[in-house]
Structure formats: C-alpha cells, structure tokens
Regions:
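A short, Lys/Arg-rich alpha-helix, primarily the initiator
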Residues: 1-14, 86-121
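Recognition helix of helix-turn-helix/homeodomain-like DNA-binding domains
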Residues: 1-17, 24-26, 39-43, 129-147, ...
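The DNA-contacting recognition helix of HTH DNA-binding domains
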Residues: 3-4, 33, 122, 132-133, ...
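Short, charged amphipathic recognition helices of the HTH superfamily
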Residues: 17-22, 117-124, 148-149
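DNA major-groove recognition helix of helix-turn-helix/homeodomain DNA-binding modules
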Residues: 20-35, 149-165
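The alpha-helix within a helix-turn-helix
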Residues: 26, 115, 125-126, 156
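Central "turn" residue of the DNA-binding helix-turn-helix
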Residues: 30, 119, 129-130, 160
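Interfacial/linker helices and their anchor residues that mediate assembly or domain coupling
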Residues: 44-102, 174-236
Length: 236
C-alpha cells in the first residue's frame, strides 16, 4: 500500500488501529511514533513527549539552528544524537493546550499535535514566511482554502515531514514540482532529534549551531533566517 494511502486511511479511521501497531507502522514509514499517533487521533503517551523546557531557550534554539545550511544541519543532528539522555527529575507531564482557542477542525488539532511533539508552540517556531495570525488560525480551524498548499509547504520542513506525506495527511493533492517554502525537512530532523534534550542541552546545541553557522549577533535587531530550502538535495 502506498504511503499516501496509508496516511489518509489513518486520518479517516486511525482510532481503529491499536497504538502498538501504530508504533510499528511509524518505524516502517520512518515517521516519529508520536506523530503517527497524533495523525491517527490517539493521545500521545507522556513518555514520548519532550521534557518541560524553558520557552525562551526553545525559541533561541530554533532560531539559531535555522541559520545552518545543509552540511551544518547534518553535523548538528549528529551532535544532538551524541548528547547523553538525561532522565527527567519527575514523571512526564502532558502540557496544557497552549493556544487561546481550542482546535475546531481535525487537521488544526493534528498540526498543533505535531508542533507540540517537538516541544514547540507557534511562538517558538523559526521564521516560516507566514504571519503569526495565519499560524494561529492554522491551529484553530485550518480548513481547505486557496493558500493551504502554500501553508503546508511552509510548515512541513520544520516538522521534519516530507511534503508528500503532510499533503496526504491534509488530503491535499501533491505534485512533484512543489518545493518547501523556507525550510526543508533537514531542519526538522534536528528539531525531532532534539525532542529528548533538556534546557541545558538545548543551550549547548544552540551554541554549537552558532559555531557552525558563524551567525553574527546584530544587537537588539536579529535578522531572521531565510532558510536553505532552495539548496535541498532532495529537490535537484
């Protein structure tokens, strides 16, 4: 069965699939288990979620990593995976809903879940080429609209999702000429690898990102990263 067909079927009737089978399927598809549980409409066990971390540190981490090109991202991902896994001092805690309004559509809830699986809220994401009001609308009631494919192209990369897969979950048609908007999934791979990291380890990783990207500080004004999607080796 094609990946797109599997993902669409999970959106339609994923609650009929046992969580253990979804974890197996996630490994087969190369998708984080927490993400596939969200897609299928299952709750994510707290042990699959990131530990509680400082939001300002998360924002700085995402910002600094977004300035790395593809070679630097690959090295940074290896750096993240080399860090020791630190056991949280207490039991895992599922975070409260982080937005002013609850999600009113299935895909809005899915998007919020995918973002939350990485320990982010809208505020911690790097520059995506979309306004904050648009992003908040997407986690409120993201319905089909004329800009939806553009919005999918913007969010897929930081989530570490391939465009065809996220398009399938959104039940949008995908064509091979579509490209990520600002960031490709190589940035999202670092964010996904960093899910288990503590606040201190995120600070360490952000410093390593600066060292590799040679990003310069500009005082109070900090220019956003324009991304490296145009150089993604997956889109020759």
């Amino acid at each position: 069965m094609e990946r797109a067909t599997i993902l669409r079927s999970l959106v339609a009737s994923g609650t009929d699939t046992a969580p253990w089978r979804l974890v197996e399927l996630a490994a087969e598809l190369g998708i984080p288990a927490a993400d596939l549980l969200v897609v299928a409409g299952h709750p994510v066990p707290a042990e699959l979620l990131p530990p509680e971390r400082d939001a300002d540190v998360m924002r700085q981490f995402a910002y600094r990593v977004s300035h790395c090109d593809h070679a630097q991202l690959a090295a940074l991902e290896a750096f993240v995976r080399s860090l020791p896994r630190v056991t949280a001092p207490g039991p895992p805690v599922r975070p409260a809903w982080p937005y002013p309004r609850p999600a009113e559509t299935r895909f809005a809830a899915t998007l919020s879940g995918l973002i939350g699986n990485r320990g982010f809220t809208i505020r911690e994401l790097p520059f995506l080429g979309l306004s904050l009001s648009t992003l908040y609308g997407m986690v409120w009631r993201w319905e089909p609209n004329r800009y939806r494919r553009q919005q999918l192209r913007a969010v897929a990369g930081p989530l570490g999702w391939a465009l065809p897969d996220l398009f399938a979950v959104a039940d949008e048609s995908y064509s091979a000429e579509l490209r990520p908007m600002v960031h490709c999934h190589h940035l999202g791979r670092v964010f996904t690898a960093a899910v288990p990291l503590t606040t201190a380890q995120l600070i360490e990783t952000a410093k390593e990102a600066d060292r590799r990207s040679v990003r310069a500080d500009h005082g109070a004004w900090q220019p956003v990263s324009q991304g490296f999607a145009g150089e993604c080796p997956d889109f020759p």
